């Protein structure tokens, strides 16, 4: 029997398993498919400073862990040694200007260096951008990493029993205490159960009378190959809030929408890669069915990217992909003990990579009964 069974092979589950094993516990990680097969392997892989102050300690713990892991990773993964730069830009629209200022100032409040740019300075810095931009905010922020390599390395770096292709059907509990999980291949017994299954977490907890306020929101990326580099740093059209988390997803309430598919929330985030390719992101939409409901989204992402940076319109399309993000109404994850022998780590939205390492640290302390590495109060069940 294991000390702990962790359900979920995304970045959150793998970070939890890594930390628990580091503490000397006998850990079994159960994943229904492959490690990083979902949103954990289908994202920008960006370390961007969160806007919300309560997330900063969790973020900093994550960065420290990834830096240590990258030096001796069992699956080598890329990690920028320092910030590549993050430029937020806006046109003349008043709402866009306000959003850009607020986002930049929120990040700068955490100590990130900020420079305000006028129209001419934007053109000198990024000449490929559209000429209707009137204000910009350049942040000394943004480190890129390989999210798949990170996730797999977290699971394999320690002595973790990884069981792939095993679907968890229920939490095994008796006498008011969880003591394992029921899978397609039988029962996995453990003294503690950690549920880190993203938006699949609520159905596992519901039979125990525990409601997790988490819904799935689909996010898309488009992968392009421009003939020449388009931008030299991360560029976001103001109003998308790539840094801030999923606050806008509070409107993605299952009770309000039922089975109706809401309109997608689409912005523009350009990410230049070391290999010369370009990742385009900036879309969120409430998930209703397992497969994408709206094939127009990646097309619209590419169209808006070409408006922000016209040379993008000539780039070769290498592909597009999507992942499902588990989101909460306030943009903060739930990382807490929710019952005897039962811990939840889910609801990280688009910030799984940003907060994953810190989440693992907190879960390790919770399971061990040790003092937490930072204030856990903002991450309780609410």
Model-derived segments and spans:
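Helical element adjacent to the flavin cofactor pocket in flavoenzyme catalytic cores
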Residues: 137-184, 188-191
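Helix-loop-beta segment of a Rossmann-like dinucleotide-binding subdomain
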Residues: 77-90, 105, 114-155, 179, ...
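Flavin-dependent oxidoreductases
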Residues: 173, 183-281, 287-292
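Short beta-strand to alpha-helix junction loop
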Residues: 57, 89-99, 137-153, 292-297, ...
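Glycine-rich FAD pyrophosphate-binding loop
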Residues: 22-41
């Amino acid at each position: 029997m294991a000390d702990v069974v962790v359900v979920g092979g995304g970045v959150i589950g793998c970070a939890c398993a890594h930390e628990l094993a580091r503490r000397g516990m006998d850990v079994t990680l159960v994943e229904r498919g492959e490690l990083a097969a979902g949103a954990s392997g289908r994202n920008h892989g960006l370390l961007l400073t969160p806007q919300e102050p309560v997330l900063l300690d969790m973020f900093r713990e994550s960065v420290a862990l990834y830096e240590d892991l990258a030096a001796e990773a069992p699956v080598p993964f890329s990690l920028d040694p320092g910030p590549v730069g993050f430029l937020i830009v806006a046109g003349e629209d008043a709402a866009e200007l306000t959003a850009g200022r607020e986002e930049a100032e929120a990040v700068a409040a955490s100590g990130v260096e900020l420079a305000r740019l006028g129209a001419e300075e934007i053109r000198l810095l990024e000449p490929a951008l559209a000429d209707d931009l009137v204000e910009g905010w350049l942040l000394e922020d943004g480190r890129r990493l390989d999210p798949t390599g990170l996730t797999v390395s977290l699971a394999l770096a320690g002595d973790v029993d990884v069981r792939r292709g095993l679907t968890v059907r229920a939490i095994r509990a008796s006498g008011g205490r969880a003591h394992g999980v029921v899978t397609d291949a039988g029962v996995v017994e453990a003294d503690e159960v950690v549920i880190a299954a993203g938006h699949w977490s609520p159905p596992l907890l519901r039979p125990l009378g525990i409601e997790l306020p988490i819904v799935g929101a689909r996010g898309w990326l488009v992968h392009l190959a421009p003939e020449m580099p388009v931008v030299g740093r991360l560029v976001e059209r103001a109003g998308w809030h790539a840094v801030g988390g999923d606050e806008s997803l509070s409107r993605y309430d299952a009770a309000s929408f039922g089975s109706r598919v809401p309109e997608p929330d689409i912005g523009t985030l350009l990410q230049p890669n070391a290999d010369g390719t370009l990742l385009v992101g900036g879309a969120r939409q409430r998930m209703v069915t397992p497969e994408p409901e709206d094939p127009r989204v990646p097309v619209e992402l590419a169209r808006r990217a070409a408006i922000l940076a016209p040379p993008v319109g000539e780039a070769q399309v290498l592909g597009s992909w999507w992942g499902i993000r588990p989101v909460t109404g306030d943009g903060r994850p739930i990382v807490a003990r929710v019952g005897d022998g039962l811990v939840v780590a889910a609801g990280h939205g688009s910030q799984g990579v940003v907060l994953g390492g810190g989440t693992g640290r907190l879960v390790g302390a919770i399971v061990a009964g040790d003092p937490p590495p930072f204030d856990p109060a903002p991450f309780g069940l609410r």
